[in-house]
């Protein structure tokens, strides 16, 4: 009885609650944050958890255990998805729906900007001025978003040229694979670049683009590739820097800052007087565009309840693809690259109204303990949604009133280095994103390398819409796969498809060519070579389409996965890392082209090996489907790895979860009682022999 009374007194004094239920390896927000202060070393038996460091006392030392619970904010306020969002009406609230739609609209403008390089910097066919278009030499050109190659035709006797790095091949020998282009100023291109003025055959619907305006051909052709990766480098730096700033000052100020400066730099790009000015301004345009993409992505995720996050994100992707599909018509309407650039940027003027319409992320305000601002925003949202105070069943507002005196607590992404699991998850997703977007160019170049033998692919619009259609099909398939397999299962499936397509393209096609080179007769040699090349071309195109399909899904799903498992306090920083990794993957395309395709095969080999590594690493990720978003780093640490397939009913898992761990906190009481008993009696009162 004395033991029971001591246990009851200890339980009531510490405010001990029953162990929280655990689903898919994560604790509900709030419970995970306070598990360490309430239970000491709670979850020390888990395989992938770390507890937060004790809060510092104002005098400089750590709080005592009796003050740790008082230092932590209310668990109710940390449970945003379970308490605050339902109080505001969830996504059913009319104002929240309006905000979600407002995050979709700019995706159309973003789609225009992301795919503008295909039109502004497309390398047209060109010939010496006065030679006439009838004598045009259609050589290697760069088409599409990924800078793909094609259009190899036979050389002409007249000294005119296409892009300086283009090469020629014998059109009549259709069985020969088009060779890699030779560097400018070497071989047959010496005579083709002796002109001082050129005429251009632009294929993108424009009368003039950047290449034709400043004659970026022959010795100046390398400037086209520099201009291409200036936008990508700006995006990479923008993701990294604006992500950290958005976690510190908020999503709304970064969004407004990015909109204002993209208007300034974007419109100035249209007034460029030389290619150096164009490339420099495109860097800053990409920097600001990254801020818009990142903040809208984070706001969209933070507005939604768990069950709606993925579909709302995919709708935004479809809107951006609509911009990709509309871009050729927009170019044909504008006719001039300067008008096209201005028309792409001007719609961002509408986003200046977002400062008065779009509020700061309430989830971020609550996670960073800015409760004074959060209270004002909650009152504003309840008024907009016509929510009565009586609907506050869980008592969010009374708890908020108690916490108004707290000081804001903001976190930088560098804090993730001190975690145990969170940094691993982010690194895995960064590698996945880098691999997905990097190998996409390998598949695209391989498919466009067969343009000579597939007449459909010789047309710019066929190239462009083929790429866009593959991306659209990938997103549609991703919606179905993620619904049934979850985030981790879907990512694993698409990565396996990417690896298979890459390895089969690299290995199987070479194997076919190897065994076709040892026939018994000359006739069999001709048949074998023809059959080999025909089969190789068909297989190569098929593997390229499958690879582009799967790699696009890998890149997109990696970004979304990161947005879900990264805590709110550092969500923009984590998103910035993964998006920057995607930018590095896309950056490999113009770099390889700048070096005249040297090292392309090694480039493909490296990314193919990365896919195999990623398949293993994906198994280490948690599953975030239908989970509440983690609000702080402690919540993010409790997103632990679980088996890909759940165990059957009645089976005991080898590793117990936190909810199944036994409580042995009363053992010291039993030991104390045992020490007080006489030597001749045991703890249950039985006499010893």
Curated annotation (Swiss-Prot):
Entries under Pfam families matching the protein: Sugar_tr
Membrane topology, record value: Multi-pass membrane protein
Signal peptide (UniProt feature, chain positions): none
Transmembrane regions listed in the UniProt entry: 229-249, 253-273, 283-303, 310-330, 339-359, 462-482, 489-509, 541-561, 572-592, 601-621
KW Glycosyltransferase (keyword) present: no
Stretches with biased composition (Polar residues): 165-177
Tissue specificity annotation: Expressed in many tissues, including brain, spinal cord, kidney, liver, eye, adipose tissue, lung, epididymis, adrenal gland, pineal gland, skeletal muscle, heart, spleen, thymus, ovary, uterus, testis and epididymis.
GO BP terms in the entry: monoatomic ion transport
Record-level Gene Ontology MF annotations: transmembrane transporter activity
Primary localisation category: membrane
GO CC annotation, single: membrane
UniProt region (Disordered), positions on chain: 1-55, 162-188
SUPFAM superfamilies the record matches: MFS general substrate transporter
Annotated compartments: Membrane
UniProt keyword terms in alphabetical order: Glycoprotein, Ion transport, Membrane, Transmembrane, Transmembrane helix, Transport
Positions of glycan attachment: 24, 274
Highest taxon of source: Eukaryota
Keyword Acyltransferase in record: no
Family: Belongs to the major facilitator (TC 2.A.1) superfamily. Organic cation transporter (TC 2.A.1.19) family.
Protein name as annotated: Solute carrier family 22 member 23
Organism: Rattus norvegicus
Record lineage: Eukaryota, Metazoa, Chordata, Craniata, Vertebrata
Gene name per UniProt: Slc22a23
């Amino acid at each position: 009885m004395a033991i029971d009374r001591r246990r009851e007194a200890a339980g009531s004094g510490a405010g001990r609650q029953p162990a929280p239920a655990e689903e898919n390896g994560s604790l509900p927000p709030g419970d995970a944050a306070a598990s360490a202060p309430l239970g000491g070393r709670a979850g020390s038996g888990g395989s992938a958890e770390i507890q937060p460091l004790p809060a510092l006392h104002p005098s400089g030392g750590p709080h005592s255990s009796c003050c740790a619970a008082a230092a932590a904010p209310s668990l109710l306020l940390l449970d945003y998805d379970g308490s605050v969002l339902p109080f505001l009406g969830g996504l059913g609230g009319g104002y929240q729906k309006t905000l979600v739609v407002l995050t979709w609209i700019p995706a159309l403008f973003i789609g225009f900007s992301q795919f503008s390089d295909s039109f502004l910097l497309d390398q047209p066919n060109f010939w010496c001025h006065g030679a006439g278009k009838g004598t045009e030499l259609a050589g290697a050109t760069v088409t599409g978003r990924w800078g793909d190659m094609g259009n190899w035709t036979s050389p002409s006797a007249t000294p005119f040229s296409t892009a300086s790095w283009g090469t020629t091949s014998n059109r009549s020998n259709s069985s020969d694979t088009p060779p890699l282009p030779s560097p400018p100023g070497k071989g047959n291109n010496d005579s083709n670049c002796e002109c001082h003025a050129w005429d251009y055959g632009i294929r993108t619907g424009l009368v003039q683009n950047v290449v034709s305006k400043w004659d970026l051909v022959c010795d100046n052709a390398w400037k086209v590739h520099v201009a291409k990766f200036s936008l990508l480098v700006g995006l990479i730096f923008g993701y990294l820097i604006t992500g950290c700033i958005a976690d510190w000052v908020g999503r709304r100020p970064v969004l407004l800052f990015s909109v204002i400066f993209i208007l300034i730099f974007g419109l100035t790009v249209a007034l460029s007087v030389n290619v150096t000015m164009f490339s420099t301004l495109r860097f800053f345009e990409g920097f600001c565009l990254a801020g818009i993409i990142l903040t809208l992505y984070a706001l969209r995720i933070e507005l939604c309840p768990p069950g709606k996050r993925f579909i709302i994100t995919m709708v935004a992707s479809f809107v951006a693809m609509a911009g990709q599909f509309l871009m050729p018509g927009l170019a044909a309407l504008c006719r001039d690259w300067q008008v096209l650039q201005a028309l792409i940027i001007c719609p961002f003027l509408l986003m200046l109204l977002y400062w008065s319409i779009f509020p700061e992320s309430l989830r971020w305000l609550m996670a960073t303990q800015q409760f004074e601002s959060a209270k004002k925003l909650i009152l504003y949202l309840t008024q907009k949604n016509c929510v009565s105070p009586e609907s506050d069943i869980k008592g969010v507002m009374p708890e908020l009133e108690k916490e108004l005196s707290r000081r804001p607590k903001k976190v930088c992404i560098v804090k993730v280095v001190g975690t145990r699991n969170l940094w691993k998850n982010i690194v895995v997703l960064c590698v996945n994103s880098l691999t997905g977007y990097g190998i996409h160019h390998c598949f695209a170049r391989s498919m466009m390398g067969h343009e000579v033998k597939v007449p459909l692919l010789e047309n710019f619009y066929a190239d462009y819409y083929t790429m866009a259609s593959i991306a659209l099909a990938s997103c549609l398939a991703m919606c179905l796969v993620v619904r049934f397999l979850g985030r981790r299962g879907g990512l694993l499936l698409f990565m396996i498809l990417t690896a298979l397509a890459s390895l089969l393209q690299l290995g199987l096609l070479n194997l076919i060519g190897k065994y076709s080179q040892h026939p018994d007769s000359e006739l069999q040699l001709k048949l074998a070579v023809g059959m080999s090349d025909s089969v190789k071309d068909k297989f190569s195109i098929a593997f390229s389409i499958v690879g582009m399909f799967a790699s696009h899904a890998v890149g997109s799903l990696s970004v979304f996965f990161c947005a879900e498992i990264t805590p709110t306090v550092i969500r923009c920083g984590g998103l910035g890392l993964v998006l920057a990794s995607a930018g590095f993957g896309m950056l490999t395309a113009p770099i390889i082209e700048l070096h005249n395709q040297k090292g392309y095969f090694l480039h493909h080999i490296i990314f193919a090996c990365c896919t195999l590594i990623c398949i293993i690493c994906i198994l280490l990720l948690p599953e975030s489907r239908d989970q509440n978003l983690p609000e702080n780093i402690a919540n993010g640490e409790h997103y632990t790895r679980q088996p890909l397939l759940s165990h059957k009913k009645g089976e005991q898992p080898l590793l117990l979860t936190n909810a199944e761990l036994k409580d042995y906190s009363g053992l010291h009481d039993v030991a104390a009682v045992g020490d007080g008993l006489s030597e001749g009696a045991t703890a249950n009162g039985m006499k010893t022999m």
